[in-house]
Amino acid sequence: ATSNGLFNFYLRSKNRVALCAIDECQDWFKTVVGYKSTSSAPSMKRLLQCYDGSHWYENKGNTNKRTGVPSAALALTCFTQPAAFLRMVMPKLVSNSNGLLDRFLLCLPLIKSATISERIEASRKLKETNLTSLDKLYERIYAKHNSSDKVMYSLEEEALDIYVRHNQSNLSSDSSEGNAKNDKNIIRLAAILHVFFNVLEQALDQRVQEISAKISAQTMTAAIALAGYFEKQRAILKQVCIPNSLKLDFS
């Protein structure tokens, strides 16, 4: 996920969203936040712009010819060891106060390893279903949304009402910091959950049909709850990076 790599992807793909997954991402983020002098990774400013799908134009070559795209959006999934990330990267993201951290959905789940007997039982149950892998699901989702035609989803009236009431409740509370970004994240999570569970249900029922264009109230309620979980996780992890705050054991 280098800056040049992303830019060239946008030039080739024309208005498609870049999907990136980075394992052990602490080193990549060290470049983003300025620990390393190399300029291979996108800057924090560029990541902020990619969150909103802003334009990206650059002057290339000796002729300074201006080239680029009107919209460059990035969906980024990162995995890391928490100790290194919280020690080296998180303090930089917190101190910059540029809003980049609030655009990420952060979580540090508790470790839970399944026993051998639990895995055997899960494998047995999986073989009894019509779906033994998520690969086909993701392939269908990709094919559906990687065409030249834009796919539009909207909220059912009840779902919109739930979303508006949640937003108004947040505005009247004392913890309104970052609400605008969290509201965007709720909409994005609602769309993700809507598409995934629609395709999952069809796969389990062994049927293929168009994905509903309307996001339900049930899905919106789930998206609000999930966004709230990520928001609380982010707040806790921010506190860990404040001097003299509670230190957690990640060993």
Regions found by a protein language model. Give the residues of each.
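Phosphate-handling catalytic cores of nucleic-acid transaction enzymes
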Residues: 1-251
